[in-house]
Amino acid sequence: MKRTYQPSKLVRKRRHGFRARMATAGGRKVIAARRLRGRKRLSA
C-alpha cells in the first residue's frame, strides 16, 4: 500500500491556497479567523 501523502506543490496551492480560500464563503471565514488569531501564514 502506498502512503496517502504524495506531495505536489500545484495540488497544495489549488486546494489550500489563498485564492482557493477566497473562492468560497467558508474559505473567506477561514482567512478572517486566521487574521484575527494573528497567524503569520494565512494559507498554503
Swiss-Prot record:
One Pfam short name: Ribosomal_L34
Keyword Ribosomal protein: yes
Keyword Ribonucleoprotein found: yes
Gene Ontology CC: ribonucleoprotein complex; ribosome
Gene Ontology MF annotations: structural constituent of ribosome
Family: Belongs to the bacterial ribosomal protein bL34 family.
Protein name from the UniProt record: Large ribosomal subunit protein bL34
Organism: Bartonella bacilliformis (strain ATCC 35685 / KC583 / Herrer 020/F12,63)
